[in-house]
């Protein structure tokens, strides 16, 4: 099953959580984030406080990775691209929900992280879920490797 970029975006929009990976001085840092989408734009927004380490990391290196994963759906998506910060009220408002009252004391302290993907890689095993357990048992019995499902790289 080959997916178009449009189909990939449809899949991504179904997720309510992901991992945002940025570069710290000497290592990669990952943290769970809630993705937000503005209309049909092919960017992902995240909301954070201006008082987090993510701000300095993004200012020093704009490269980032966003990873979506669903064992239940048999779908894994990795996006590589660039991040930038936006304190534009429209970007913050697009993300703000009541749940952020618990994380960010003052809405004025909120800033949006705008992620623009440049490439994507996904693994789709959704059509194999029913036979995945059998494939695993068979490969153990035969000392072989199971079929991991489909993998595709996309330039965005």
Where are the regions a protein language model picked out?
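C-terminal edge-of-domain segments
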Residues: 108-156
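A short, compositionally biased
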Residues: 12-16, 61-62, 116-117, 147-148
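Short, structured beta-strand-loop surface elements
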Residues: 53-102, 107-119
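Short beta-strand segments
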Residues: 16-50, 56-58, 64-70, 76-79
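Short secondary-structure boundary/capping segments
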Residues: 10, 36, 103-105
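Extreme N-terminal tail/first-helix region
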Residues: 1-19, 25, 140, 149-153
